């Protein structure tokens, strides 16, 4: 179960020797939808969370509810792109600039 992407209340406990090995083990997968880091030192937990390759990473708890304005999505084989809020709009649109000259030209020729 450790190497598969599962959806449900599942916990895999793997013993590691320190934060660097924990990050290496966490990133050693083809998936990357969601992750979690638990620790007493919030600043250290946040630094570790930033090093994990996932679309979402929680510190000291799972998602309690989805928030529509947050950019939801994974990385690697867990998906491409984000949906939700401005990030979702940006992911599925292409910004363009189109102009139309309707009157006399602004600059003389």
Say what each PLM segment does.
Residues 1-109:
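Conserved C-terminal structural/oligomerization subdomain of aldehyde/semialdehyde dehydrogenase
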């Amino acid at each position: 179960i450790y190497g598969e992407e599962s959806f449900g209340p599942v916990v895999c406990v793997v013993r590691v020797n320190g934060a660097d090995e924990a990050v290496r083990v966490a990133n050693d997968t083809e998936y990357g939808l969601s992750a979690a880091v638990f620790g007493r030192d919030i600043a250290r937990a946040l630094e570790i969370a930033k090093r994990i390759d996932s679309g979402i990473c929680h510190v000291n708890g799972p998602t309690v509810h989805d928030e529509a304005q947050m950019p939801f999505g994974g990385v690697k084989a867990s998906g491409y792109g984000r949906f939700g809020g401005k990030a979702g709009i940006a992911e599925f649109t292409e910004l363009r600039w189109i102009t139309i000259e309707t009157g006399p030209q602004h600059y003389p020729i």
